[in-house]
Amino acid sequence: MKKILSLLVLMAVFTSCEEDVKFNTPAVQGFKNNELWKADAFTATLTVDGSLVIQATSGLETVVLKTSGYTPATYTLAVNDRNKASYSTIDDSGAASDYQTIAPDGTGQIIISGDPRETDLAKGYISGSFHFNAVNDEGLIVYFADGVFYKVPITGVQ
């Protein structure tokens, strides 16, 4: 009887241990004003002038990250127009709100990963991290922290 009971306990333990881990590859996400923001769709584009543009959308919200290059490096935002981030949204009434890092009080960084397991232009994907404060015309600030873009597919050159 003890053996049967032990066997039943072991069976219950092993059948209840199910791993429900979902991998988010590729992905663009971060914390917008302390709440998790995850993109539904995203693309990375290399431009003819050598810059990188990553566009990520979630419903009626869009984040655009632009760097002056696509080589692994840290790109400081708000210094010039070539390195910038923007966030835009459309509310229920159809009014658009646009936030930019090139406005006063806009700051941040985009870091392109140099790890060949994460960024491989020949295979067509790029990874890195970002954080930024962006300001709209009324002076309101939206901030993104702990942002990550991981193995975002490069869709082409424009």
Regions found by a protein language model. Give the residues of each.
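Well-ordered beta-strand positions in beta-sheet-rich domains
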Residues: 36, 64, 109, 141-149
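Bacterial signal peptide processing site
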Residues: 18-21
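Surface-exposed helix/loop patches within compact recognition domains
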Residues: 28, 38-123
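Sec-dependent signal peptide recognition
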Residues: 2-7
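C-terminal or internal capping secondary-structure element at the end of a domain, subdomain, or sheet
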Residues: 115-158
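C-terminal motif of bacterial Sec signal peptides marking the signal peptidase cleavage site
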Residues: 13-16
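Acidic, metal-coordinating catalytic segment for phosphate/diphosphate chemistry
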Residues: 25
